[in-house]
């Protein structure tokens, strides 16, 4: 495996280069969300997959400057087909632990609060 240091808004690979693209607890940390989303779409090949794991609906911070909505998956629907999406409680901010515990988001609780979105997409 070769590691390449690059900005998420200018991925140094040709279009349709990757079979799988992952954004794991990173999308709310990027400098330019629109450019990053465009790059994800650009570098994923047709029939390839995009895996998204992100915190949503939280106040921006210095390290997480972007407040992503619960509807973040819709941002990718013009290019990808949503294969699966799950929502989890934010808990103690241990994203992977919440998924392993299967701590699903309680949709019956009307409180406006942060959470986690885990989604799998297939590129059209």
Per-region residue spans from a language model:
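S-adenosyl-L-methionine
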Residues: 1-5
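Core SAM-dependent methyltransferase catalytic element
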Residues: 93-124
């Amino acid at each position: 495996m070769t590691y390449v240091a690059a900005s998420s808004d200018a991925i140094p690979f040709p279009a349709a280069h990757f079979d799988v693209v992952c954004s794991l607890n990173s999308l709310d940390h990027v400098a330019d969300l629109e450019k990053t989303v465009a790059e994800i779409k650009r570098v994923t090949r047709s029939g390839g997959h995009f895996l998204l794991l992100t915190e949503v609906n939280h106040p921006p911070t210095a390290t997480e400057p972007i407040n992503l909505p619960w509807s973040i998956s819709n941002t990718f629907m013009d290019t990808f087909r949503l294969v699966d999406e799950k929502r989890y409680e934010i808990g103690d901010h241990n994203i992977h632990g919440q998924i392993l515990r299967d701590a699903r988001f309680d949709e019956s609780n009307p409180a406006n609060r942060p959470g986690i979105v885990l989604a799998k997409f297939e590129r059209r």
